[in-house]
Design a protein with these regions (language model features):
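Repeated polar recognition positions within modular binding domains
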Residues: 92-96, 186, 190-194, 205, ...
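Secondary-structure boundary elements
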Residues: 147-202
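Sec-dependent N-terminal signal peptides of Gram-positive bacterial secreted proteins and lipoproteins
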Residues: 2-29
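Solvent-exposed loop/turn segments at secondary-structure junctions
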Residues: 185-190, 208-210, 235-238, 268-272, ...
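A short, highly charged nucleic-acid-interacting micro-segment common to nuclease
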Residues: 99, 199-213
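Hydrophobic/aromatic-rich core segments of domains that either
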Residues: 212-287
Length: 416
């Protein structure tokens, strides 16, 4: 699979404002008569993120959707044979009556189910000899013998270390957040690393491209009992804008949370902008298709299709979309008590950022202009008043707008 070239997409920031001019001649800490701390709004409790499971009770899962996609006994037998030879210490040839097409399907299904088996050379996955009545295949490895054993041991130790650092008691949604954040904090996009296309590159080297991120994410989730699959596809519009071929491949994931499937693109979540960490976190199929093209299932692929999928769930729920779940939504500029409560809580925690969504029922540009002209000042005035005995917000505070996702971020500067 050809790598997807990752470019930081901080360009989603479309505007910024400094509130200093609005504060001219005003003290930010003397509004106690108007905003008495005793009247401060409180944050409403969020709905449950799902049933919490103790870390020690979490069991590894392998959903086996690749195997399940194989519709005949012959294909399933070929899948098992591939598994047998994938787990040998050295490359060995084996003979089968299967066609090249069937072999590609079975191998793709096996790879989809086993992202932890990182040693297949993805630049040349297999070689074969055509005998006319049968084929002799050999899977090509990145490592063999003692090197392979050592690499497996290193990988397993690292994976154990990662999963042991997961929250001691957490829902599947919280485990998903952990896996997303682990990769963002410990892996960087790198097109030069020889292991960039697999989970080893992401977890051991800390350097990978999209399929390395995706496979590592699947490995972490599956190891912690969260169903996760890889999705192959393209991002042609993004590729064209960045000088790439429109058919350059991309890979991301789907996860199953509380019975519903969601798309998540950890590679695109890894960037410079603060809010980008959760930009593509638990999206519907309709939403992800705005800039991702999902490759066809094997049965539907054309000869010209380089990539295919063995399983693509339909994702229709936005219950666990990170931004809709974690960010307060502004529905009316003059009915802002819920927003103020969240803003105040962020300041009391000492957070660097405060994020919220603008309702799709509001005109985004008009709303953010009103925030720049007046409401941003009003909210900071209110938070400083409500928090009179604690941290105070400085006039150098800025806000950033992300119109494509209807979000706003306050980059909070505190008075020393």
């Amino acid at each position: 699979m050809r790598p997807f070239k990752y470019i930081k997409i901080a360009a989603i920031i479309t505007a910024a404002a400094v509130f200093a001019s609005a504060f001219s001649g005003c003290s930010l800490i003397n509004f106690f008569n108007r905003y008495n701390p005793s009247n401060a709004p409180t944050v409403a409790p969020k709905s449950s993120s799902g049933s919490a499971v103790a870390l020690g009770d979490r069991k590894q899962t392998n959903s086996g959707y690749g195997y399940s996609s194989l519709g005949t006994d012959e294909l399933r037998s070929l899948y098992d044979t591939i598994g047998e030879y994938m787990n040998k210490s050295y490359e060995e040839e084996f003979t089968t009556n299967a066609s090249l097409s069937d072999f590609d399907f079975a191998l793709g299904a096996y790879e989809a189910d086993h992202p932890e088996e990182f040693w297949l050379d993805l630049n040349s996955r297999y070689s074969y000899i055509d005998y006319g009545f049968s084929f002799s295949f050999k899977l090509n490895f990145e490592f063999e013998g003692e090197q392979l054993s050592a690499a497996k041991e290193t990988f397993e130790q690292k994976l154990s270390e990662i999963t042991s650092s997961a929250p001691q008691e957490a829902s599947d949604y919280q485990i998903e957040i952990f896996a997303n954040n682990y990769l963002i904090d410990n892996c960087s996009y790198d097109n030069d690393n020889s292991m960039r296309h697999n989970a080893y590159g992401a977890l051991i080297d800390g350097k990978a491209v999209c399929d390395g991120y995706s496979k590592a994410f699947q490995v972490i989730c599956n190891s912690l009992g969260v169903e996760c699959v890889g999705i192959n596809g393209y991002c042609p519009e993004f590729n064209r804008e960045n000088g790439e071929s429109s058919d350059t491949g991309h890979m991301w994931n789907c996860v199953k949370i509380d019975g519903d499937w969601y798309h998540i693109d950890v590679t695109w979540n890894d960037g410079d902008a603060h809010i980008q960490r959760y930009l593509y976190f638990n999206m519907t199929t309709e939403k992800i298709k705005e800039n991702h093209v999902i490759s066809p299932l094997f049965a539907d692929k054309k000869e010209s299709d380089e990539l295919f999928n063995v399983f693509v769930p339909e994702c229709t729920s936005d219950k666990y979309n990170y931004m809709k779940r974690e960010f307060v939504t502004l529905y009316n500029l003059d009915e802002d008590s819920e927003l103020l409560a969240e803003f105040l809580a962020a300041v009391q925690r000492g957070d660097r950022y405060f994020d919220f969504l603008v309702s799709e029922d509001l005109d985004y540009q008009q709303t953010t202009q009103s925030i720049s002209d007046y409401y941003g000042y009003k909210w900071i005035e209110a938070v400083n008043g409500y928090n009179s005995g604690g941290a105070q917000i400085d006039s150098e505070t800025q806000f950033y707008t992300y119109q494509n996702i209807n979000a706003v971020t306050f980059d909070i500067k505190y008075i020393n």
